[in-house]
Structures are given as C-alpha cells and as structure tokens.
Amino acid sequence: MKKIFFQFSFVILIIFLLICINTVSFAQTTVADSSKKSFRLFEDDKIIEITLSLDLTTYFKLKPKDEYLKANLTIHLSKKDSISRDIGLKTRGIWRNQNCTFAPIELNIKKAAFGYTDLDKISKLKMTPQCNFNKINEDYVLREFLAYKLFNVLTDTSFRVRLLRVNYIDTQKKRKPIIQYAFFIEPLEMLSARTNCLPIKLRTLNQKNIIPRIMDRLSLFNFMIGNYDWSVPGQHNVSVIKSLSYEPTGLGIVIPHDFDWTGLVNATYAIPTEEIGTENVRERKFFGVCRSKEVYKQELDMFLGKKAEFYRVINDFLT
C-alpha cells in the first residue's frame, strides 16, 4: 500500500512539475513575443484613448518646465484591456505655456517599459492638448492636427502625429475628470532615424542653408495654410535635419511644427504683428526665397498634383 501511495505521489509530483515548467515557458514566450511587437504609434490613424492622472492644480497654475511632475499614463487598448505606467510630466512651449490653461506637455516615458518596440525606444514624447476648455479650443487643436497631416502628404520628412482622446484625472481629487482631444508628435530622433538623417541644432542657420526645393516646398505650404509664425534662423517652429544618404552639399532639410497661429486654425489669439503687415492670419503673404517663376512653377505643379490627396485627408478627417 505504501509502495502504491509512493508511486501515485511521485506521478502527481511529475505532473505538477510538468505543468509548472509549461506555464513558465508559456509566460516567458508571451513576454518575448510582446517585446517584438510595434504599437504602431505613428503608423496608424485610429484615435487612441488614454488616461492621464496627475496633480492638475500644479499643472494648471505652476506649469513646471524644469522638473517633472509624477503622473500615470494609461493607454486603453480596448474596452477591457489597457497598459498603465508611472511617468514624468512637465510643460513646454512659450506663448501657449503662458496663456493656455492646458500648456503643451512633454511626457518622460524612458523607464515606462510598455513592451512595444516603438514605444520603448522613446524617451520623451510631446503632447499637444487643446489650449482651454471651450468648444472653439477643441476645434483649434483638431485643425492643428490636420495641418500636420497635410504636410505629411507632401513629404515623408515631416512630423507624424497621432490623435488622442484624453481623460485627465486629478490625483488630488479636487477636480472632476476632464475629457478632451490632444495629439502626440513624433520625436525628432524617431523622425531622423526613420529618414536616415541627423538633427541639426545650429541656431545660426538661414534659408540659404536649406536644400532649395525643400525650402520652396515649406514656403509654399506655409503660404497655403496662412502660416507666418516660423523662421529658419533660430529654428522658430521648425526643425532642421541633414540626410546621411544623399545631398553631399551639406545643406539641410527643414521641417515645420506648431501650427496654432496659422490661418488654417484661425485662432482668435493669432494676431499678426505690425511687421507682418496683414490684418489677420487668413490674409496670405509669401515669405519664400526670391527665385525665378520657372523654379516655383515646378514646385506649384507638385502641389497641384497632390490636390486630390489633400482633399482625401481633409474629407477623411471630417467623416
């Protein structure tokens, strides 16, 4: 009887060990497979639902730019599935930082370990929320998002964006949850790696340091959307990168960002300065380099060739 009991117990032990081994192996495989997946943060267009938990009073009133606030970011993958990680949050920008209730945000997700290849390569992620609470500010942030998508039509060397619906939760429980639109902006390092380029930080650059056709394309695009709020010198609302695979001339590629002062957005606060010489941002003025009509005609023909795609992007956005 003891022998039978011993054999039976031994068999149970072996089965238990096999189950444990298989369970451990399966868990390790799952983690490994997850780490190889891309979240497709800037490849897909579907709106992302996120929850951002932080001390809203400190964010609204102090708008810290030097030190990160403790925050928690939850990405809702579906109605039942989500990823939640502790992160750091601080504000950025100049005009909107000083004048908006919701200042532009930088999320520090370097140590978040989401388990997705693209997310885990990002250290700092820019987020553009709507400026204030009312409906018109919701329209502004959506139109600014659209401006990025329109420039994507012209070139791959452009900042990709991802639309968000954000649920702001006050960790101090002094405010009710706030739900608004916002969008993520592709980090410059990610854009540079994607296009095989190198970021150029020199503030002394001017338009003559940019590849001519790239400079003309940007000037015409800004004319099209009524954008005066940019400058290559000082890299005001533009970033400059240099290709590592072509253009041996050493000239750079200029990429625009921050479109809230454009005629396309038409924000009430976007008032041209006296130096611009226009009454409003919907009155166009061209700020390109002086070139021949033939040169600009080539670039204008390219814009006309993209007309159908421009309309497709706009119509898809409106539906």
Residue positions per predicted region:
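Bacterial Sec-dependent N-terminal signal peptides
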Residues: 1-29
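Phosphate/dinucleotide-binding and metal-coordinating scaffold of catalytic cores
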Residues: 28-319
